[in-house]
C-alpha cells in the first residue's frame, strides 16, 4: 500500500493510526490562525472552552484546517496525491453515492497510466454518466466494511 488519500474531514483515519495518509480536505482536529499561523488542538478548545480568537497575534479568529466553499486544496497535499497516484499499480476508491470531481480526476490520472481502479460502493452508482474509456475500471457493489475486512484478511497490518 503506497498510502491513503482521504477526502473526509473527521480525522478518524489519523486517530486510528493510518500511515502514509494525505488528508486532502484537512481535518477538524486542529484550528489555526490564517494571519500568524498559530495552531491549537480542537480538544483544547472544547475542554477549556477557549475562545476562537488567536492567542498569539490577537488579530484573527481561528478556523478549522479545512477548505471552505471556494477555497482550493492545499497545493502540497495535491502534489503528494498526484505523486502517489502516478506511482500506484491499483487505485481503490470507497464511495458513498457519488464521485466528486477531484475523485474523478484521480481516476483519470490512474487510467492514463493503464492501471486498475476499483470503485467500492454499497449503493449503485450510475456508471453510465462517467466518461471512463478504459476497461481497467471496475465498480464493486459491496459494503465498504465487508470489502475492508477482505483487504485486512489478505494484507494484514500492511493495510495501514
Language-model regions, residue ranges each:
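Conserved catalytic alpha/beta core of Sir2/sirtuin-type deacylases, generalized to analogous enzyme cores
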Residues: 1-160
Amino acid at each position: 500500500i503506497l498510502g491513503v488519500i482521504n477526502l473526509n474531514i473527521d480525522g478518524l483515519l489519523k486517530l486510528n493510526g493510518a500511515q502514509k495518509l494525505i488528508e486532502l480536505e484537512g481535518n477538524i482536529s486542529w484550528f489555526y490562525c490564517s494571519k500568524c499561523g498559530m495552531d491549537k488542538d480542537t480538544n483544547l478548545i472544547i475542554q477549556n472552552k477557549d475562545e476562537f480568537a488567536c492567542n498569539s497575534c490577537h488579530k484573527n479568529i481561528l478556523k478549522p484546517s479545512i477548505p471552505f466553499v471556494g477555497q482550493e486544496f492545499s497545493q502540497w497535499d495535491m502534489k503528494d496525491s498526484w505523486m502517489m497516484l502516478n506511482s500506484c499499480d491499483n487505485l481503490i476508491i470507497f464511495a458513498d453515492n457519488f464521485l466528486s470531481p477531484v475523485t474523478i480526476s484521480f481516476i483519470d490520472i490512474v487510467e492514463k497510466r493503464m492501471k486498475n481502479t476499483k470503485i467500492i460502493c454499497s449503493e449503485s452508482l450510475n456508471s453510465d454518466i462517467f466518461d471512463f474509456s478504459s476497461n481497467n475500471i471496475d465498480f464493486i457493489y459491496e459494503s465498504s466494511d465487508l470489502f475492508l475486512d477482505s483487504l485486512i484478511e489478505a494484507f494484514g497490518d500492511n493495510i495501514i
